[in-house]
């Protein structure tokens, strides 16, 4: 079928219309007085959410070109979510503001490529300034406050995260489960997380989130490659009879064996997943032993005379829950306290004996994974709709706390970006010229957009509030919850620097794609075939 081709200004304006629709749908959720969005579902009850990236994923427009604009900005939100775990609404609002300002200049005859260069240079300047303004966080209460702000200023979330951090430390793993009651509860259990995910995406049990979640699984831990199907059968058969899932951790699984596991998983014969072993060399073997001890199983290794093809069911480890993503695996086990404590003491002795700071650091990592545990937040709610919304908010909060630990915190509520506007203008005017300068000034005019929207959602005049904020000290901003100007650090209104930086970088990157677009090629939907003739009328037929 012939394709539709749209050029230059018409193409960019069509993309802009899609971006306008997406940005408005997402922006209503921004700030402490942001509204919820109701998502209609084809099957099941509607979903009520306050999460930018979730809303963005649901928006599909009838016009293909406009929908392409939606898809571009959706990528900015998704990328920010992947990198920082939060800041998706900020990224969307920023990208929208850049596109609006940029297209105005392109329509007036500015060179889009030179504008992009100016925007790129402005991005690098702003990223450096954000890092300079960031403060490191050590106190668990300060870290928890970051999570509360991310979850919409929810005090229950703040208390929950503070308690979790106190119990398992700021580097701890905090995971979410759906609870059985109406109250949200915190439970700290023995657990371990390592940075290896499933070998094949076909192992994912939740296609929407691309996660494999197994309750009460068996765990086979092997320090060798698994090449043959015959090696797997003696393990697969008894596990299938037991009716429980199986997770295999091995150095690698070759094609034939992997195909067998995938086929069994897809046919529903056995709920199974395979994960590559973490670490390298001797350290890999030690980490596999840690996993085996944590789950009450045995490491299948030829050094101990054990092979996969003669492994019994009682040699396998057992876990309460295992969650696997494409990048990581979290094991929650219980009931093996004595063996775990003995292993922890053994690692501590090794740390005392070693003189290498590198080895000591790696031993410390293993110690933290074994003894730190996993904090499990069991999300409770009166209805399923409320639970989904609460879970998304808690997920944002946990991601925000991790980001805060990594790169520190900056004043929240759009303050940082608004205050950087005069700094960027001064730098650009002294450093850049011509259309590169115009590109940087486009960014400067767009930076207050998140603050303006937060103020507007609180019933204030966004432009007036933004101008008043620029006149004040860097840490002072508009508190939309109380309609007052306060010191954001003192008031505990802070954002992770990583979230602010990622939102800025991704918004500017994807906005530049729209500005530099010259042509859009669209494949129209095929028209319905004409109905066949009636009686002997000799109507048209499609062959």
Curated annotation (Swiss-Prot):
Record organism: Anabaena sp. (strain L31)
EC?
5.6.1.7
Q: What class of enzyme is it?
A: isomerase
As its record notes, the protein acts as a catalyst of:
ATP + H2O + a folded polypeptide = ADP + phosphate + an unfolded polypeptide
Q: Which GO terms describe its cellular component?
A: cytoplasm
Encoding gene per record: groEL1
Q: How does it assemble?
A: Forms a cylinder of 14 subunits composed of two heptameric rings stacked back-to-back. Interacts with the co-chaperonin GroES.
Its biological purpose is as follows:
Together with its co-chaperonin GroES, plays an essential role in assisting protein folding. The GroEL-GroES system forms a nano-cage that allows encapsulation of the non-native substrate proteins and provides a physical environment optimized to promote and accelerate protein folding.
Stretches of Gly residues bias are at 533-543
GO molecular-function term, one example from the UniProt record: isomerase activity
**Is Cytoplasm one of the keywords?**
yes
Where is the stretch described as Disordered?
524-543
Name a single GO biological process.
protein refolding
The protein's name is Chaperonin GroEL 1
Q: Which InterPro entries match?
A: Chaperonin_Cpn60_CS, Cpn60/GroEL, Cpn60/GroEL/TCP-1, GroEL-like_apical_dom_sf, GROEL-like_equatorial_sf, TCP-1-like_intermed_sf
Record Pfam families: Cpn60_TCP1
Task: Report the locations given in the UniProt record.
Answer: Cytoplasm
Q: Does the entry feature the keyword Isomerase, yes or no? A: yes
UniProt main location, coarse: cytoplasm
**Induction record:** By heat shock under both nitrogen-fixing and nitrogen-supplemented growth conditions. Induced within 5 to 15 minutes of the start of heat stress, levels peak after 1 hour and expression continues throughout the period of heat stress.
Q: Which family does it belong to?
A: Belongs to the chaperonin (HSP60) family.
Q: Which UniProt keywords apply?
A: ATP-binding, Chaperone, Cytoplasm, Isomerase, Nucleotide-binding, Stress response
Q: Which residues bind ATP?
A: 29-32, 86-90, 413, 479-481, 495
């Amino acid at each position: 079928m012939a394709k539709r081709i749209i050029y230059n200004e018409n193409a960019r304006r069509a993309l802009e219309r899609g971006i306008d629709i997406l940005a408005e749908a997402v922006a209503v959720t921004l700030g402490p007085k942001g509204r919820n969005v109701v998502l209609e579902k084809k099957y099941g009850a509607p979903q009520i959410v306050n999460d930018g990236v979730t809303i963005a994923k649901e928006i599909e427009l009838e016009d293909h070109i406009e929908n392409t604009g939606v898809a571009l900005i959706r990528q900015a939100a998704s990328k920010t979510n992947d990198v920082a775990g939060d800041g998706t609404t900020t990224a969307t609002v920023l990208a929208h503001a850049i596109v609006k300002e940029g297209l105005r200049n392109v329509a007036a005859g500015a060179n889009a490529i030179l504008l992009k260069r100016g925007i790129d240079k402005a991005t690098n300047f702003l990223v450096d300034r954000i890092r300079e303004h960031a403060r490191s966080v050590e106190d668990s209460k300060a870290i928890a406050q970051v999570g509360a702000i991310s979850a919409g200023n929810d005090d229950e979330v703040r208390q929950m995260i503070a308690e979790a951090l106190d119990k398992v430390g700021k580097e701890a793993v905090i995971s979410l489960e759906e609870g059985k009651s109406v109250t949200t509860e915190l439970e700290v259990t023995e657990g371990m997380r390592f940075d290896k995910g499933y070998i094949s995406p076909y192992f994912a049990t939740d296609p929407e989130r691309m996660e494999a979640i197994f309750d009460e699984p068996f765990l086979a831990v092997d320090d060798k490659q698994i090449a043959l199907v015959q090696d797997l059968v003696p393990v697969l058969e008894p596990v299938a009879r037991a009716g429980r899932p199986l997770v295999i951790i091995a150095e690698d699984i070759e094609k034939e064996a992997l195909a067998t596991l995938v086929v069994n998983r897809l046919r529903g014969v056995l709920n199974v997943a395979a994960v590559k072993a973490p670490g390298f060399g001797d350290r890999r073997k030690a980490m596999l032993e840690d996993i085996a001890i944590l789950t009450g199983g045995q490491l299948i290794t030829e050094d101990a005379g054990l092979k996969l093809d003669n492994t019994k069911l009682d040699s396998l480890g057992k876990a309460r829950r295992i969650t696997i993503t494409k990048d990581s695996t979290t094991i929650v086990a219980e009931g093996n306290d004595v063996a775990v404590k003995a292993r922890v003491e053994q690692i501590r002795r090794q740390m005392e004996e070693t003189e290498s700071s590198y080895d000591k650091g790696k031993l410390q990592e293993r110690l933290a994974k074994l003894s730190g545990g996993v904090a499990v937040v069991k999300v409770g709610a009166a209805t399923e709709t409320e639970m989904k919304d609460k879970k998304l908010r808690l997920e944002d909060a946990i991601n925000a706390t991790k980001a805060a630990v990594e790169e520190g915190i900056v004043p929240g509520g759009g303050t940082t970006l608004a205050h950087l506007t005069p700094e960027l203008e001064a730098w650009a005017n002294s450093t850049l010229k011509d259309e590169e300068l115009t590109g940087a000034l486009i960014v400067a005019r767009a930076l207050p957009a998140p603050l303006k929207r937060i103020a507007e959602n609180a019933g204030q005049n966004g432009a007036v509030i933004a101008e008043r904020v620029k006149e004040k000290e860097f840490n002072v901003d508009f508190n939309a919850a109380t309609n007052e100007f306060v010191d954001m650090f003192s008031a505990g209104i802070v954002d992770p620097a990583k979230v602010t930086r990622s939102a800025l970088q991704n918004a500017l990157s994807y906005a530049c794609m729209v500005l530099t677009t010259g042509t859009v090629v669209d494949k129209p939907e095929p028209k319905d075939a004409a109905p066949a003739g009636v009686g002997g009328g000799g109507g048209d037929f499609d062959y």
